[in-house]
């Protein structure tokens, strides 16, 4: 029996793409900061001259799937993290945006076999979003951990030709 697991020690050489929604940037900037901090602390060189981490900004969560797909098709990235914040309003717009964003991002994962981390907050209020992107609990950190684990896991499986 073979057991495959992601290994954080083997993740510092991963090429990581991050796609960030500019809408609700008060939140998404905090998520990105937590994400970058986690990557640094796990040995990923996030300096711009190293080209280990690339960041693309899009207008909103609805645009995340397209740019994620374009990044994935380059085959440069071992894993891609999507970051966004969709906060419920008084209209059905919230439901449409999050439905299309989540389906689109999932489709990219299936079509490319590149792990895509779904880091899009869906909250009822700005306060809930701030709590999830804050100092005590920044989900951006967790999304980066997922990326390191999934990137190293997929690479291990490729080496074993599973």
Swiss-Prot record:
Which CDD domains does this entry report, sorted A to Z?
Answer: Lumazine_synthase-I
- Binding of 5-amino-6-(D-ribitylamino)uracil: at which residues? 23, 61-63, 85-87, 118
Task: State where (2S)-2-hydroxy-3-oxobutyl phosphate binds.
Answer: 90-91, 132
Pfam families with a match to the protein in the record: DMRL_synthase (PF00885)
Please list the residues that make up the active site: 93
For this protein, the record's InterPro entries field holds: LS, LS/RS, LS/RS_sf
The UniProt entry's GO CC annotations, sorted and at most eight, read: cytosol; riboflavin synthase complex
GO BP, one annotated term: riboflavin biosynthetic process
Q: What is its EC number?
A: 2.5.1.78
Q: Name one GO molecular function term.
A: 6,7-dimethyl-8-ribityllumazine synthase activity
Q: Which domain of life is it from?
A: Bacteria
Catalytic activity line of the entry: (2S)-2-hydroxy-3-oxobutyl phosphate + 5-amino-6-(D-ribitylamino)uracil = 6,7-dimethyl-8-(1-D-ribityl)lumazine + phosphate + 2 H2O + H(+)
What's in the keyword line of the UniProt record?
Riboflavin biosynthesis, Transferase
Pathway entry: Cofactor biosynthesis; riboflavin biosynthesis; riboflavin from 2-hydroxy-3-oxobutyl phosphate and 5-amino-6-(D-ribitylamino)uracil: step 1/2
Q: Which family does it belong to?
A: Belongs to the DMRL synthase family.
Function, as annotated:
Catalyzes the formation of 6,7-dimethyl-8-ribityllumazine by condensation of 5-amino-6-(D-ribitylamino)uracil with 3,4-dihydroxy-2-butanone 4-phosphate. This is the penultimate step in the biosynthesis of riboflavin.
Return the protein name.
Answer: 6,7-dimethyl-8-ribityllumazine synthase
Query: Which organism does this record belong to?
Result: Synechococcus sp. (strain CC9902)
This protein's encoding gene: ribH
């Amino acid at each position: 029996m073979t057991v495959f697991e992601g290994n954080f020690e083997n993740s510092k050489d991963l090429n990581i793409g991050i796609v960030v929604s500019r809408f609700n940037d008060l939140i998404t900037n905090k998520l990105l900061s937590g994400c970058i901090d986690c990557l640094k602390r796990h040995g990923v060189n996030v300096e711009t001259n190293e080209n280990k981490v690339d960041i693309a900004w899009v207008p909103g969560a609805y645009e995340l799937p397209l740019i994620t797909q374009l990044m994935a098709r380059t085959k440069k990235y071992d894993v891609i993290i999507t970051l966004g914040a969709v906060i419920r309003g008084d209209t059905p717009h919230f439901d449409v945006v999050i439905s299309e964003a989540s389906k689109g991002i999932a489709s990219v994962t299936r079509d490319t076999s590149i792990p895509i981390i779904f880091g899009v907050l869906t909250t009822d209020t700005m306060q809930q979003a701030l709590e999830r992107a804050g100092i005590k609990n920044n989900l951006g950190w967790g999304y980066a951990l997922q990326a390191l684990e999934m990137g190293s896991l997929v690479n291990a499986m490729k080496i074993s030709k599973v």
